[in-house]
A protein has these predicted regions:
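Functionally constrained cores in energy, signaling, and assembly domains
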Residues: 10, 18, 23, 29, ...
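Ligand-binding grooves and catalytic loops that recognize ribose/phosphate and carbohydrate rings
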Residues: 26, 34, 55, 117-121
């Protein structure tokens, strides 16, 4: 599998794994021991507020039986920049709700999301 295809598959493991609460797909998407999500949520007043959380903790929330995932519609990869054999960046439109950027790393031959930065649209 070419790097671009493997990166795309990893991003969609995250996107679809989140929507279906699929722990296996989520853990395949992230470098779980080091990955973080950082971004701007809109607070109750509609103002952007900076937020950060480790993915190890976030995956636990997402697979909880009580958790209800947001519905995003279709996700779209807007760009992929592979800048070395072990590093890449991806810009992803999360169904028009969020604009995500991913820092990707290649670990043991597999592309993983190391960090995600997002802005609530």
């Amino acid at each position: 599998m070419q790097d671009y295809d493997a990166i795309s598959e990893t991003v969609f493991h995250y996107f679809e794994g989140y929507q279906t609460k699929d722990r296996e797909r989520l853990e395949r998407a992230f470098a779980v021991d080091v990955a973080n999500m950082i971004g701007y949520w809109k607070n109750n007043e509609g103002e952007l507020e900076l937020f950060t959380i480790p993915y190890k903790e976030l995956i636990e929330r997402w697979v909880d039986p009580e958790f209800i995932p947001q519905e995003f519609g279709d996700g779209n990869i807007l760009s992929v920049h592979i800048f070395s054999d072990v590093g890449a960046t991806v810009v992803f439109d999360c169904g028009g709700k969020y604009l995500d950027t991913f820092q990707m790393v290649k670990l043991d031959g597999d592309w993983k999301i190391a960090n995600k930065f997002f802005v609530d649209q």
